[in-house]
Amino acid sequence: MYKISVILTTYNCDRIIKKTLDSILNQDEVDKKFKLELIVVDDCSIDRTVEIIKTKNVLFFSTKKNTGGPNKGRNIGLKHSSGDFICIADQDDYWKPNRIISLLPFCEKYPIVTSGFFVVNNKNKKNSVRVKENNEGFIYYRKNETFIKILKKSKKGQNTYLGSIIFSKKLKKFIFEEYFGAVDYDWLLKIFYQNESLEICKPLYVRNVNDKNLSLNEAYRTKDFFFSLMTIEKYFDDYPTEVKKANLRIHGSRARYYYLTNNMVLARFYFLQSEKNLKTFFYYLSTFIGSNWVKRNFNVFG
């Protein structure tokens, strides 16, 4: 019987952590078709988070001091994981009961399997489903196909949100960067490099988006911007075309973040360094007038 290790990092989340823990621990067919190992690493919470975690059947660890991001905890979890396959969860993710049992049949053949997911936007109350359609119920990606997609910062192709991934223990040797402590771009490139993968065409977890998400945090966006530029430089000799495309898209992402946060001066600055297309042109024009309408009606960022 296969064992699944789930690595969950936490910090000051006592209002939501019980629901997250229960959604992982109460998976369909657990102890019948697979074993489950839930590893929780807390980043020195000062609320009731740890108290709640310790009421559950989990392996618990804590960082020695607050690190300001999840990556140190993820690496601790990887070190202590003993499963055949590994998932990484965020503290505000909620798993559907059939998540593992839907992914497991494909894990033996493919080193990386992903799925679709639900997005619950707690800020603007606009919910959505991110899932691909395929008559077979899954989509196969050739060796290095998803690596190239990630390197180019393309939104097409396989879904690679961290919470959607289950991967083989053979890939646990790849660890997360701890200098910035929160960025996963280089880690995704490492695990998908020279690997084939599969995506299940089902939404199997809920990704909550709100003002506290790192993806909408200014400090995180700054770290992600500079670390992404540093990361793509390493691949320039082998993939020059893809790196040039990534550079433009990284600047475009930076521009849209400032657009979303109403800093239109910086938004214009970064739009001018991003891809030259109609979408960028209209975004740039709307920084002068119409941005509120755009933000209400389109998914600008995230």
Residue positions per predicted region:
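Short, well-formed alpha-helical segments that are part of the catalytic scaffolds
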Residues: C13-D28
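Acidic helix N-cap motif at the loop->helix transition within catalytic regions
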Residues: R15-K18, C44-K54, Y94, N98
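A conserved acidic beta->alpha catalytic loop
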Residues: S23, D42-V50, T67, D90
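Glycine-rich, basic loop-to-helix element that forms the pyrophosphate-binding segment
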Residues: K64-S81
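Conserved donor NDP-sugar-binding/catalytic core segment of glycosyltransferases
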Residues: I100-R130
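Conserved nucleotide-sugar donor-binding catalytic segment
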Residues: F138-R221, S228
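Catalytic core of nucleotide-sugar-dependent glycosyltransferases
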Residues: P203-D211, L216-V243, M264-S274
